[in-house]
């Protein structure tokens, strides 16, 4: 059972996510092994790397050490690339010498559903938390810090190069899904981090969000996950993202019965009530996408969109041209408009929004925008929004309502909630 705690903050996770020295336990010269691939990926790292394996004297041109205790310096982070049975002893040694973080590749723990394997994972978590050692995994493919060129992962052919402007911090329980999403780099989308949590025996998705919320290199956060041990901790992390003006975009997997069953066998998490998660996401002002392929595109939009020039209230009009915007005003469709304050230039649309971006082809594809009355629309996820909007609105290819900063301004004196996560719009729907 997960012990109640607050999310880990940026300073507590720095040695895990942004280390200066790394030890690779189980380092191997055998091509194709996870340890060999991890060693290759660490070549781009600018800090010190210590291979650890008692069977070898040298690997990849570096002297190999017999144990962690034999290292000349205590590493910030230890990448553990050995079999499951040897992991617990290495974690104990990490804690003993004062290592800051550890990444565990090995699988076969709680995700198997076997009591002894679940207990083994719990012991690792207990050691880590008692000694202040932050652990990613087990059953984790690793961590990427694109900003520093760090790849603690056994995934082959990794792409690390990334721009810095409008960079997204990507958090995924599934390493395979996370690695797939990093292909967005080929399309010019910038990433600051790709963080895989696996079984999350210690560090989980909420902690990753907390870290990215306070990292200046990250401009927006994209989360894809199956379930979490503590919804309260996820909401705490979401509140931190809100407070630091970092839009949080979420795709929740395992929403159907079959998907929930797959989630349990994949990462060891019960997917949980979709209704409960949606309520939590709404309360923290998160942007929820219904399709996996929309996650990165939506996060990229919010990462690149500059804040409004002023704190003017009213309606944001998104149009392909100034003439189109003026036409809407002349026809009396817009009752109150602050379009001048929110004007943006292609290709980076302006005006961050707390929710409500259209990715589909029809009005039924609008995600996050619900019609509260014929005269006004409210940024509020509601089961009846499709029927209320259908036939009344013919939205453009991209529709953004409200402004992320305006939402924060409206709820500055209250915790993120429905009240703070809503913006009144004055658009006639007839």
PLM regions and their residue ranges:
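Catalytic-core regions of core metabolic enzymes
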Residues: 1-430
């Amino acid at each position: 059972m997960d012990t109640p705690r607050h999310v880990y903050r940026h300073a507590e996770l720095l040695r895990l996510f942004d280390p200066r020295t790394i030890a690779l336990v189980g380092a191997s010269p055998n091509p194709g092994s996870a340890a060999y691939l991890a060693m290759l990926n660490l070549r781009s790292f600018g800090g010190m790397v210590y291979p650890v394996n008692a069977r070898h004297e040298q690997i990849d041109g570096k002297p190999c050490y017999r144990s962690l205790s034999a290292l000349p310096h205590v590493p910030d982070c230890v990448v553990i690339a050995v079999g499951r049975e040897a992991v617990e002893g290495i974690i104990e040694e990490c804690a003993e010498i004062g290592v800051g973080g550890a990444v565990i590749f090995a699988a076969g723990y709680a995700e198997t559903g076997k009591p002894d394997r679940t207990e083994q994972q719990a012991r690792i978590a207990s050691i880590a938390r008692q000694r202040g050692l932050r652990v990613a995994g087990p059953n984790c493919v690793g961590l990427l810090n694109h900003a520093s060129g760090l790849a603690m992962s056994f995934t082959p052919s990794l792409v690390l190069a990334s721009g810095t402007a409008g960079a997204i911090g990507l958090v995924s329980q599934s390493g395979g899904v996370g690695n797939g999403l990093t292909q967005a780099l080929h399309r010019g989308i910038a990433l600051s981090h790709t963080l895989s949590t696996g079984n999350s025996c210690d560090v989980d998705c909420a902690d990753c969000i907390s870290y990215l919320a306070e990292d200046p290199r990250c401009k927006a956060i994209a989360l894809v996950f199956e379930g979490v041990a503590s919804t309260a901790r996820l909401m705490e992390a979401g509140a931190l993202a809100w407070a630091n003006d970092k839009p949080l975009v979420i795709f929740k997997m395992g929403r159907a019965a079959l998907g929930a069953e797959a989630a349990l066998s994949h990462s060891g998490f019960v997917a949980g009530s979709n209704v409960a998660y949606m309520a939590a996401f709404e309360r923290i002002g998160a942007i929820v996408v219904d399709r996996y392929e929309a996650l990165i595109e939506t996060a990229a939009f919010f990462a690149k969109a500059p804040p409004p020039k002023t704190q003017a209230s009213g309606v944001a009009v998104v149009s392909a041209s100034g003439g189109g915007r003026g036409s809407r005003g002349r026809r009396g469709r817009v009752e109150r408009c602050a379009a001048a304050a929110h004007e943006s230039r292609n290709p980076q649309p302006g005006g961050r929004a707390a929710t409500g971006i259209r990715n589909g082809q029809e009005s039924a594809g609008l995600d996050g925008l619900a019609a509260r009355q014929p005269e006004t629309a409210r940024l509020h996820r509601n089961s009846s929004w499709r029927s209320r909007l259908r036939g009344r609105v013919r939205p453009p290819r991209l529709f953004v309502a409200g402004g992320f900063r305006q939402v924060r301004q409206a709820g500055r004196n209250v915790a993120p909630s429905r009240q703070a996560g809503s913006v009144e719009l004055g658009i006639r729907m007839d």
